[in-house]
Regions:
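C-terminal motif of bacterial Sec signal peptides marking the signal peptidase cleavage site
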Residues: 15-17
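Residue-level signal for mature regions of secreted extracellular proteins and peptides
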Residues: 11-12
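Carbohydrate-active catalytic/glycan-binding domains of CAZyme proteins
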Residues: 20-365
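Bacterial N-terminal signal peptides that target proteins for export
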Residues: 1-8
Length: 365
């Protein structure tokens, strides 16, 4: 584990288009590259970070990432080697400027119901209170989603005594619409256990991957409107329907397009953009809808495969431009030790997103 140290790093943000497909297993060793081969450079180097959820509040940019550590668990397809134990918030006054690494904002030892694996978080603000949403495994080995509060966006955050009632799986992402209503999107298959919670109840003996039904609709992420105090679901979670160009649900066997994990929602010119990772094919993709509940029609790729296995992101508007926060394994070359990055995101005139290549040169053979 790397210790925190105060420091800054000036980053250079570039933009590019096009890319290539890379298919690899969870335990594959990434091909190492020289720093100039990457489109963007790591935001921080003091600690390993991933799964960046970025927000613009009070004129500043706050990033809520996972905090990767080098634990003893052997790498597997369930992500058991992702042994995160706490959260630290990154902040910056501008993209391209110094980045501050905050102290511990929340530690697993302070969450009474949680046992381990504090994976990808998100955050929200309402009436001066900041909310940190996070998944963790309970003592039965089931992922639940908790919430902690603070008056400071950097924390420290005080957790609620129990997870959100009716929550399960991983990757919470909270979107607040123009009318003030907030919605949580969540879920992830394989190690994220969505396939073990099909009926809202955790089955410890369920599938380790998905439902194994390639010719039937893929497992869908979930969405639920939040209560006014942002601490609970105001309704039972419902599936988020992702459709193809013919209006049919994406199938479980369509690994290049179907949902795997890493939900994110943003709004652009009145349309709702639901983006997510395809997991084992390593694409970051998106679909567009007319309502925060969907349905959403698949439109294409945002980001081609990065170095490392996972792709988890956020999209925010800052200074009149749109930005994609993501992560790769540039610093370590290990899938469990990642680093967050940012690059500019561009829309075409028709509202589609131009695909980004995370590298500046083709991959070596």
């Amino acid at each position: 584990m790397k210790r925190w140290a105060a420091g800054v790093l000036t980053i250079t943000v570039l933009a590019a288009a096009c890319g290539q497909q890379t298919q690899k297993s969870e335990d594959a060793s990434p091909v190492r590259r020289a720093a100039p081969d990457y489109l963007s450079q790591p935001l921080v180097r003091e600690i390993y970070t991933a799964d960046p959820s970025a927000h613009v509040w009070n004129g500043k940019i706050y990033v809520y990432p996972s905090h990767d550590v080098d634990g003893p668990t052997k790498q597997d397809d369930l992500g058991s080697h992702f042994e995160m134990r706490d959260y630290r918030v990154l902040s910056m006054d501008k993209i391209g400027g110094p980045v501050r690494v905050g102290p511990v904002a929340l530690d697993v030892k302070d969450v009474g119901w949680a046992d381990k694996q504090m994976w990808a978080p998100d955050a929200a603000v309402k009436n001066g209170t900041y909310y940190l949403y996070f998944p963790a495994k309970d003592r039965d080995g089931a992922f639940r989603i908790g919430v902690a509060t603070s008056r400071n966006p950097m924390g420290p955050f005080k957790p609620q005594p129990a997870p959100i009632k009716g929550s399960y799986s991983i990757d919470p992402a909270v979107f607040t619409d123009d009318d003030g209503s907030s919605y949580m999107y969540f879920g992830g298959i394989w190690g994220g256990q969505l396939q073990r919670n099909v009926n809202g109840r955790f089955d410890p003996n369920g599938s380790k991957t998905d439902l194994g039904q390639d010719d039937k609709p893929a497992l869908a992420p979930r969405v639920a409107r939040m209560t006014g105090d942002m601490l609970e679901f105001a309704e039972p979670p419902r599936p988020v329907q992702i459709l193809d160009e013919k209006g049919m649900p994406l199938l479980g066997g369509d690994h290049d397009r179907r949902f795997f994990e890493a939900s994110w929602m943003h709004k652009y010119k009145g349309k709702y953009y639901f983006s997510y990772s395809t997991g084992d094919t390593h694409y970051l993709v998106y679909a567009i809808g007319e309502s925060p509940y969907g349905p959403f029609t698949y439109k294409g790729r945002i980001l081609e495969p990065v170095e490392g296995w996972t792709t988890h992101h956020s999209i925010v508007r800052w200074n009149g431009r749109w930005w994609l926060f993501y992560a790769d394994s540039q610093l370590s070359g290990q899938t469990r030790l990642r680093n967050v990055k940012v690059t500019e995101l561009h829309y075409a005139a028709d509202g589609t997103i131009r695909t980004i290549n995370p590298f500046t040169s083709p991959k070596a053979p």
